[in-house]
Amino acid sequence: MAKGRTTRTKQKKRVAVDHGVVHIKSTYNNTIISLTDPTGHVLSWASGGTTGFEGTRKGTPYAAQLAADKVAKDAVKMGIKRVDVIVKGPGAGRETAIRTLQAAGLEIDNIRDATPIPFNGCRPPKRRRV
């Protein structure tokens, strides 16, 4: 008779850094927030989709707020107190995510906007007609 397999959930490690980097990628359809150590290894992440939203609601400021709150709680749990914020993209969740990180008790050292700007790169999609 086969024995039942037991599954073990992965425990989050407490990282020995007190400073982290929060990357916020905010598009019109979603907001993805990643917490990394200064070398770039991802410690925690969340998005509008992982917080339970589907479709166009993933791109709302409220979805970004919930995602930022989850990442901030993980950061505090790991012992991270100070963060740098790098923001990419034109979406609606940029400001809300930064405010939520501050409200959760993280000290923001600096905010950098790293939105990629093309030097006349790809041709944009044709204009939408409704």
UniProtKB/Swiss-Prot annotation:
Pfam families: Ribosomal_S11. Belongs to the universal ribosomal protein uS11 family. NCBIfam families: PRK05309.1, uS11_bact. PROSITE patterns: RIBOSOMAL_S11 (PS00054). The keyword Protein biosynthesis does not apply. This is Small ribosomal subunit protein uS11. It comes from Fervidobacterium nodosum (strain ATCC 35602 / DSM 5306 / Rt17-B1). Located on the platform of the 30S subunit, it bridges several disparate RNA helices of the 16S rRNA. Forms part of the Shine-Dalgarno cleft in the 70S ribosome.
